[in-house]
């Protein structure tokens, strides 16, 4: 009989395991503000002073790679290596770590090591990758904090490829581990693993239109269903799914074929028996499993008896050797549909040659047929993929180079610009998807120059509001998810940003001409000292904020660090950058259209992508309003009579009980504030504006900034948050 808890609970505090009724249960539409406070130092055992790049520089990189190479063929009884080589397992681990990335919001990917944590550690498509990470643990234990899990998983994939004969394109470290699940990532609404598109809360609508920003076709899959759409073995329709999914992961058709064929050159699928024999995923397993899952009761449960995807067999006859055999086999045979021992759809060649039979993974004396998945068959039957497959088949070196480059892109897409790269194997070549910025080959401006330029900027016709708006529009394109965007490069002057609707009110042709004139005059009067447009845009915003603070009575210098450079149109991939276009920006009261998500939800999402805390988000909104930095100079939320002065008027007037608020539209997306006594109109507001007086948590912080003793605090906090946003992409000064 269980003893009574001395604290008065039945057996434990129900809230420890979400057993009690929570705020979310009472108010299911409540905003999730926790995404603005995740990954705090309270969960990080390494502390706020830990400098990963500094630790990585102490790493004996060659020794680590040697240890990883040795591990590849050091088969363990508790999870024996297929064909005596763990390489294919580590490739799958690295691939699935990186493969969650999607271009829509830049989230997912390899850069945080989140495969260690829920939900990814328990996704059906990640079955048995827990074993791969356990195999790596002795090496992680040995090298400690000098190598993150995020970097180690990708490096293990690279070493695996090299150990099996592929010349890789390169590797960069710099991925920093997180220590709790990433709750900001939307994986879909389905409440069932691998739910098909006909089920409730499907990610598909219309004629198989995939919901944005999702890339995977089913909940719990990394890419597509290997058996075919919704498990239907149709290679042509599978090709359609593949093209959409890989495009949303920033891959074109050639990269898609290279990755599919290159990845499937190695290893095998596992479906030795009925999946009903497989136990629960790691998060659902008991204590004695110690974080492992998918423990199988089918015969030995490992080796040739392993059950993972349900598909059974290898693609090639030499699954631990880099070669062109994938195409040899795929393109040389007619294929027939069959089912694996686990009941999964797969394809086998008709009358295969002896040389195209594979050894059993744990018995070299036994020969088995090779297989293809429905997704593989798309590489042969989709007309576009088929042409690429044929070309790669005829040109093995081109294929090897294409795969090496695509693999590097896959595993580094969310790492950010090259200024963030660390380690001895960084490729010298600049790649367009890295959003390259030219190196600075001139002397940058000093403090004296900065003061001169600030005077010129403030005396121009742009004014405080326009200077602030230009700097914000440039810098706030940054996404901390994949470290893209930001002010460096001055891409606001280039396509596609120059033509974005969110920038239309800035009159960029005229505004940039003024800045270019200031830039040209300064540069022509100095021999080797120059100012970039990128620096000038940010400096203009900083100068305007500084003036606005002074006009509010506070003589506080706004920090500015020069060193940005100007990118060219040739260095800017227009289609790729289109994903950074804001559909809404609550900091400017901008929304491109009406969406199923509310404007306040979109604000929280934007703030999270800018890596802002709740106080930083609040102080920036309040400051931007009084600075007159709204989209199209709208008066929504401008609760002040002194526009351009950095005061706390937004909070003072929002929280003033003399004002009553009324919706002006049936949708309640705009409001007017009227004097409670006279009924006269005082202000107009958006949903975002009223959020800071409506939401209890946000109101609590807003009250701090509305206090009489917080005027200077508001200014200082705004400047700190502003400076943070201006420098979000300055990895060159963060190392």
From Swiss-Prot:
InterPro entries, per database record: Catalase_peroxidase, Haem_peroxidase, Haem_peroxidase_sf, Peroxidases_AS
Entry annotated with the keyword Oxidoreductase: yes
Cofactor dependency: heme b
Gene3D superfamilies: 1.10.520.10, Peroxidase, domain 2
Chain's gene name: katG
Gene Ontology MF term list: catalase activity; heme binding; metal ion binding
GO cellular component annotations of the record: cytosol
Protein name: Catalase-peroxidase
The organism of origin for this protein: Aliarcobacter butzleri (strain RM4018)
Cross-link (Tryptophyl-tyrosyl-methioninium (Tyr-Met) (with W-95)): 223-249
EC number of the protein: 1.11.1.21
């Amino acid at each position: 009989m269980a003893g009574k808890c001395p604290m008065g609970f039945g057996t434990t505090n129900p809230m420890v395991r979400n057993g009690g009724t929570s705020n979310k249960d009472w108010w299911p539409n409540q905003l999730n503000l926790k995404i603005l406070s995740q990954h705090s130092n309270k969960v990080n055992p390494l502390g706020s002073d830990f400098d990963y790049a500094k630790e990585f520089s102490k790493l004996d990189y060659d020794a680590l790679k040697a240890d990883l190479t040795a591990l590849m063929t050091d088969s363990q009884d508790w999870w024996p290596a297929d064909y005596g080589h763990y390489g294919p397992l580590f490739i799958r681990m690295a691939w699935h770590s990186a493969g969650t990335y999607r271009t829509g919001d830049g989230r997912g990917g390899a850069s945080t090591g989140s495969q260690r944590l829920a939900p990814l550690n328990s996704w059906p498509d990640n079955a048995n990758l827990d074993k791969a990470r356990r195999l790596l643990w002795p090496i992680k234990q040995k090298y400690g904090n000098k190598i993150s899990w995020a970097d180690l998983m990708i490096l293990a994939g690279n070493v695996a490829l090299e150990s099996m004969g592929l010349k890789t394109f390169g590797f960069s470290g710099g991925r920093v581990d997180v220590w709790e699940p990433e709750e900001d990532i939307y994986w879909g609404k389905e409440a069932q693993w691998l739910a098909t598109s006909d089920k409730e809360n499907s990610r598909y609508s219309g004629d198989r239109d995939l919901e944005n920003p999702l890339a995977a076709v089913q909940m719990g899959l990394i890419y597509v269903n290997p058996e075919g759409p919704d498990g239907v073995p149709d290679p042509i329709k599978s090709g359609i799914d593949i093209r959409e999914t890989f495009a949303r992961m920033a891959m074109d058709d050639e990269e898609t074929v290279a990755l599919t064929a290159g990845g499937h050159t190695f290893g095998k699928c596992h479906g030795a028996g009925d999946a009903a024999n497989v136990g629960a995923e790691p998060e659902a397993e008991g204590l004695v499993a110690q974080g492992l899952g998918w423990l199988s009761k089918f015969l030995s449960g490992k080796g040739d008896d392993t059950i993972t995807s349900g598909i059974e067999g290898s693609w090639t006859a030499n699954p631990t050797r880099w070669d062109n055999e994938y195409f040899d086999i795929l393109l040389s045979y007619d294929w027939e549909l069959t089912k694996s021992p686990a009941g999964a759809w797969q394809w086998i060649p008709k009358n295969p040659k002896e040389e195209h039979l594979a050894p059993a993974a744990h018995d070299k004396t036994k020969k088995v047929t090779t297989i293809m998945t429905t997704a593989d068959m798309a590489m042969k039957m989709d007309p576009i993929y088929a042409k690429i497959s044929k070309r790669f088949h005829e040109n093995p070196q081109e294929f090897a180079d294409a795969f090496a480059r695509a693999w590097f892109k896959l595993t580094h897409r969310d790492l950010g610009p090259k200024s963030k790269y660390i380690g001895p194997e960084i490729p010298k070549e600049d790649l367009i998807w890295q959003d390259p910025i030219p190196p600075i080959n001139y002397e940058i401006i000093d403090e004296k120059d900065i003061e001169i330029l600030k005077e010129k900027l403030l005396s121009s016709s742009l004014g405080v509001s326009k200077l602030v708006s230009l700097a914000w529009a440039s810098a706030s394109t940054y996404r901390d998810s994949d470290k893209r965007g930001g002010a460096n490069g001055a891409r606001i002057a280039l396509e596609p940003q120059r033509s974005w609707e969110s920038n239309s009110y800035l009159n960029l042709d005229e505004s940039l001409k003024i800045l270019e004139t200031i830039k040209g005059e300064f540069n022509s009067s100095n021999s080797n000292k120059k100012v970039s447009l990128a620096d000038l845009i940010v400096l203009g915003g900083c100068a305007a904020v500084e003036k606005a603070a002074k006009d509010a009575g506070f003589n506080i210098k706004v920090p500015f660090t020069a060193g940005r450079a100007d990118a060219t149109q040739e260095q800017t991939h227009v289609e790729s950058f289109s994903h950074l276009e804001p559909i809404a920006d609550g900091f400017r009261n901008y929304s491109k259209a009406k969406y199923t998500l509310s404007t306040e939800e979109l604000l929280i999402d934007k703030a999270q992508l800018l890596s802002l805390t709740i106080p930083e988000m609040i102080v920036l909104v309040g400051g931007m309003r009084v600075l007159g930095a709204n989209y199209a100079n709208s008066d929504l939320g401008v609760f002040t009579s002194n526009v351009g002065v950095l005061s706390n008027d937004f909070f003072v007037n929002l929280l003033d009980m003399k004002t009553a608020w009324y919706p002006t539209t049936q949708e309640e997306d705009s409001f007017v504030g009227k004097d409670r006594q006279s009924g006269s109109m005082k202000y107009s507001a958006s949903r975002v504006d009223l959020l800071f007086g409506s939401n209890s948590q946000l109101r609590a912080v807003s009250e701090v900034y509305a206090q009489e003793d917080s005027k200077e605090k508001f200014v200082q906090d705004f400047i700190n948050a502003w400076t943070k946003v201006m420098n979000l992409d300055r990895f060159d000064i963060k190392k």
